[in-house]
């Protein structure tokens, strides 16, 4: 584990039996902790969201667009609240169209791994590996 930018990436004061990756000064836990856009901090936000909407996480699960090769889209619903998770699982851009009957203008963007507008247009272009979670009214 690359803990920080110190000798041997902070892993050991002894001689490691495997070489430390040369990127240890910039790719390490200490740097990730300080970077609000790091994967570590994205997962922390995801965990907070899961705790905040615990009832929904235990609620019903509906897979949307099961045949789409690029987008993994599902809804979780409970107690009158609904979350929609949309993930582009490909290395190419992907177009998402809000389902008929949905009200994207009332959707609240709760989490994204990119800086985004709210995505309330009828069509959203997702960047490679982009994920968004919306609270639907």
Residue ranges and their predicted role:
Residues 4, 64-66, 99, 112, ...:
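A structural detector for beta-sheet-dominated domains
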Residues 23-25, 113-116:
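Short helix/strand-capping connector loops at secondary-structure junctions
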Residues 1, 74, 115, 132-136:
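Short beta-strand element of the conserved SAM-dependent methyltransferase core
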Residues 34, 101-104, 118-120:
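Short, glycine- and charge-enriched coil/turn segments that flank and shape catalytic ligand pockets
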Residues 120-137:
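C-terminal beta-strand-rich structural cap/linker in extracellular carbohydrate-active enzymes
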Residues 87, 116-118, 129:
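A conserved amphipathic helix/loop scaffold
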Residues 1-83, 89-94:
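Loop/helix patches that line or flank the sugar-binding groove of alpha-linked glycan CAZymes
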Residues 93-114:
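Beta-strand-rich binding/interaction modules
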